[in-house]
């Protein structure tokens, strides 16, 4: 066998070994998971990255060293695997981190604190500025106080509430509020408070329950201390800020989380639109003129929206795929051209969205159009890839059934098992929101936060935004590719730092610009591919 053939066979063997482990749902590996030669080849080819000595995560040869995607995608699996290997069952995440995870907050932290009776009180640096600190502790959860979630050992919600430091209530009020509101059995909290007695913590939690409209739970805590222990509980408010209504008692954490995000953010959107001097919502008087503007802005919108996602788009390509005689079935060039297929899918989806906009400006409800339409728009986006055999039709019939990760972001979208409920909650929030500006801005943000599909979420979120803007008589608003960094940074601030201000200002300013520059949008010329890559 020639040397080149031997190398090719060795590469295939290494990749086959990696695929076998991947098919088991694994992203994190130990030295012994591979034959030494396979491991060396995978590292050299860029398919593995070493995190710590003897610990590896799956990567991609296309990733730059600064790219955080592979690390963030593997982070929680690494934490579970590393500490299970090091301490067995003798470890638990901090009460604060436990509470965050119970509240469906999967954001990758800068540092994670782990307790174990066998810990060495050391900090270990991890990739991209993250770290772990293992804290030796004699106090470990009993079987009743522990919970295991995706291999991560946590304090139960009740015990985490009792053990978090008081400053956590103000620093992470949304996480605390979600867990308080989702608690069904208050007896678990009372049990953790009275054995041993913690009257100060009881006062903190009783007031916290009152802040989220759980008077029954607060009274149960106070009365239990009085009846069972003869102790008086003095309530103290640790939130230090108003707590918004989240939803029904016992509702799922993801629904409560989205409701809380919406309520905390809506006034900031209203303020941003006022500051940008965007006029109040109004009915569209000249519907034909409005729709002509939508038609004329299509090429500009398609170029920018697709370029943001990393496709190589030109004015000529957009024009070519928009013609009735464009044929992906019999043209081998079209079959192999992902940019052309994406551009055609965008044209098909835009056509559907345009009809939804037409119905909205004719008096229809933008929330109803979004609820019934967003899955169809997604299907149209990827139908050309189904047509040429690059995707199976069954992958487009529902929300994602796997976890997704965002390139360069610390935000980890909700797990696949809660996506349906999250999207139903989002649609309800939009339907009940009276302000069209709030519908559009928060609808876009939370659509991307949930990330309901395996791909195309950014395009779908921008479509959703424009349908919702139409409900207020606002013009179709293009997010420009030259603003990509500010756009994504503002979304990151909203999702990770809970700061909606940058994103609200960004969208308000773009809407103001669209109002000032209607009815005609300038067309772009031939443009080359941006220097970034496509992300889900």
Predicted regions and their residues:
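FIC/Doc superfamily catalytic core
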Residues: 1-33, 43-53, 59, 63-536
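Non-catalytic DNA-binding core/recognition domains of DNA-processing enzymes
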Residues: 38-41
